Amino acid sequence: MSLGAKPFGEKKFIEIKGRRMAYIDEGTGDPILFQHGNPTSSYLWRNIMPHCAGLGRLIACDLIGMGDSDKLDPSGPERYTYAEHRDYLDALWEALDLGDRVVLVVHDWGSVLGFDWARRHRERVQGIAYMEAVTMPLEWADFPEQDRDLFQAFRSQAGEELVLQDNVFVEQVLPGLILRPLSEAEMAAYREPFLAAGEARRPTLSWPRQIPIAGTPADVVAIARDYAGWLSESPIPKLFINAEPGHLTTGRIRDFCRTWPNQTEITVAGAHFIQEDSPDEIGAAIAAFVRRLRPA
């Protein structure tokens, strides 16, 4: 299958809390739920989802303000908080009638949202596959040194110009954390939701300001602490897709999640957006994980 720019499946739309949200929903059976983070969309999973064809209902949602989902209006510095994203995604997942045998496949902010949802709906979770994830609250010392200054700038007033005007998260952070060069078609797909300067790009700025680092923001730190404690004891089957060299889930963060029970680990090539470097390896590992959970 390997690399390709063509999206997977057909975008569907549903009204959630007065806004139109976009998602992919292909196949039948118990769901395999793929959730992206910042600044991506369901497009991130296009070369991975085909590996799971025939294993269940393949769902990938675009977070509010991202991908083909509507922007929030009015917008501003107080919008697109973790809590607001969770409210919209919880409502969307509820509307999709996921049932009680859900396999979660999560990355980046999708991991925070997915781990949090799983802790709150543990009786409905069949398994969790995760990669480049926020496995616990962070300290700045955990954050990759080469990006520390930039992410601290995002959390200051300077972030407004860096992201809302210069589109740094899409133009610099995204391609900089992929080992291969993206094609023009691939970059165009990632740029498309954020072409207009200003508030259209607000989601990609609010997200780095919500990362649970050094005790801030307190609500997200508490959520990450709660799910970290739960995952470190939960018997729910887990697949940890480790990245080499990796970016976020390294060092202490990786050491911690490696202690989680009932877990399988594989390693693939990649920095942070590893779906763009190792889609076949990731897809094959997820498919094998699901087959173990759902023997024919």
UniProtKB/Swiss-Prot annotation:
Subcellular location: Periplasm
SUPFAM superfamilies membership: alpha/beta-Hydrolases
Enzyme class: hydrolase
Keyword DNA-binding belongs to the record: no
This protein's UniProt keywords: Detoxification, Hydrolase, Periplasm
Gene3D superfamilies, per database record: alpha/beta hydrolase
One of the protein's GO biological processes: response to toxic substance
Domain AB hydrolase-1: 31-155
Pathway assigned in UniProt: Xenobiotic degradation; gamma-hexachlorocyclohexane degradation
Catalytic activity: 1-haloalkane + H2O = a halide anion + a primary alcohol + H(+); (3R,6R)-1,3,4,6-tetrachlorocyclohexa-1,4-diene + 2 H2O = 2,5-dichlorocyclohexa-2,5-dien-1,4-diol + 2 chloride + 2 H(+)
Gene Ontology CC, one term: periplasmic space
Active site: D108, E132, H272
InterPro entries: AB_hydrolase_1 (IPR000073), AB_hydrolase_fold (IPR029058), Epox_hydrolase-like (IPR000639), Haloalkane_dehalogenase_2 (IPR023594)
EC assignment: 3.8.1.5
Key word S-adenosyl-L-methionine present: no
Gene Ontology molecular function terms on file: haloalkane dehalogenase activity
Subunit structure as annotated in this protein's UniProt entry: Monomer.
Family classification: Belongs to the haloalkane dehalogenase family. Type 2 subfamily.
Purpose of the protein: Catalyzes hydrolytic cleavage of carbon-halogen bonds in halogenated aliphatic compounds, leading to the formation of the corresponding primary alcohols, halide ions and protons. Is involved in the degradation of the important environmental pollutant gamma-hexachlorocyclohexane (gamma-HCH or lindane) as it also catalyzes conversion of 1,3,4,6-tetrachloro-1,4-cyclohexadiene (1,4-TCDN) to 2,5-dichloro-2,5-cyclohexadiene-1,4-diol (2,5-DDOL) via the intermediate 2,4,5-trichloro-2,5-cyclohexadiene-1-ol (2,4,5-DNOL).
UniProt-recorded name of the protein: Haloalkane dehalogenase
Source organism of the structure: Sphingobium indicum (strain DSM 16412 / CCM 7286 / MTCC 6364 / B90A)
